[in-house]
Amino acid sequence: MDKVGKYEFLAEPFHCDFSGRLFMGHLGNHMLNAADFHSTDRGFGMKYLMTIKRSWVLSRLAIEMNEMPEQYTKFNVETWVENAMRFFTQRNFAVVGKDGKQYGYGRSVWAMIDTDSRQPCDILSVKDGAINDWIEANKACPIDKGGRVKMSDKAEFVRTIDTHYNDVDINGHINSVKYIEHVLDLWNLEWYREHRIQRFEIAYVAEAHEGDKLSFYMEKEDNNDVSSLTYNVRIVRTDGVECCRSKVKFV
C-alpha cells in the first residue's frame, strides 16, 4: 500500500455555491474524509481508535486554492502524513483534477485525545508507533504552514450565533467544518460576487458544545498593504473562552 492515499470525490451541485463551484466547507469535509480513509486503511484511523477510547481531533487546517472545482467535476484528494511527533502529527493534502489539474493544497495538524478524559494522548504509543511506517516527507506541499493568527483589542464584534444538533460531530463537540462555514458566513453574497477565497486558515483552541453561543470578532489584517484583503477572526464561546481563530485571504 502506498504512503500517499488518493480518493475520488465529486463536486455535487448541492455542495456548490451560487457560482457553481464547490463550497470551501465541503472541500474541507472532503479533506477530513480523505484523512479518515487514509488512516483507517493503514490501521490508525477512527474505526480502530474508538475501540481503545482514543480519537483524532483537528488542531489546525490551512487550505490554499488556485480555483475551486466546478459542479459535476470529479477530482482526487491526495493525502499523506508529513511527520509524527508524540502529541501532534502533520498531514498534507493535494486537490487534483482527473486531468492532472492542480486545484490547490492543504496542510493540517492533528492531535489524539482520550475520549473519556478529553486529554491529549501519545500518538506514538498506538500500535507501537505504526504511524511512523507511513510518513512521506519528500512529497511537495508548496503552501505555507501558517502561524498564529494575531489579533488586537480593536477587533470588531460581528455577531453571536446559537449551536444546535447539526453542529455536533462524532466526538460530541462542534464540528470542525461548521466553524469554517460560520466564519465564511461573515461576508455576504455581494462580497463573494466580487471576491474569491484564496487561502483559509483555522486553528482550534478549545471545544464548544451544543447549546453554547459563539461570538465572532473580526479585523482586517494590518500588513501595510492597503490593497490587502486578509481578515482575522476570533470565535469565543458562552463562558468567554476562545474556541478558535481564523484567517481568510480574498483576491
Language-model features, listed with the residues they occupy:
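Acidic/His-leaning functional-site neighborhoods
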Residues: R159-K247
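HotDog/MaoC-like acyl-thioester-processing domains
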Residues: D2-Y7, E64-G147, Y204, A208-E210, ...
